[in-house]
Regions:
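Non-catalytic peripheral regions of nucleotide-handling enzymes
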Residues: 1-81
């Protein structure tokens, strides 16, 4: 029987994000961003061949959801709990 790959519940998922001129999210999957509650930068594993650099945003969306999205390289992901 082939081994099935388990996907972690906490694994970030790709998301479509539009940004303004300074790189702050304005929409997430076509839902408007009402507010940016917090923004932070994580830089880790800088001593390895593959360092980690992510810019996180905690957002309030027009549909009432609170989400955390982050930019890593050239892609956006949403962090789900």
């Amino acid at each position: 029987m082939p081994e099935r790959r388990r996907q972690s519940v906490y694994q970030p998922q790709r998301v479509r994000v539009r940004t303004d001129a300074v790189g702050e999210p304005t929409t997430v999957d076509a839902v408007a961003v009402e507010a940016i509650r917090e923004e932070w930068l994580v830089e880790d594993r800088w001593w390895t061949p593959e360092p980690l650099r992510r810019r996180y945003f905690e957002l309030v969306l027009a549909d009432g959801r609170n989400v955390v999205v982050f930019r890593e390289a050239s892609r956006w992901l949403v962090q789900r709990a």
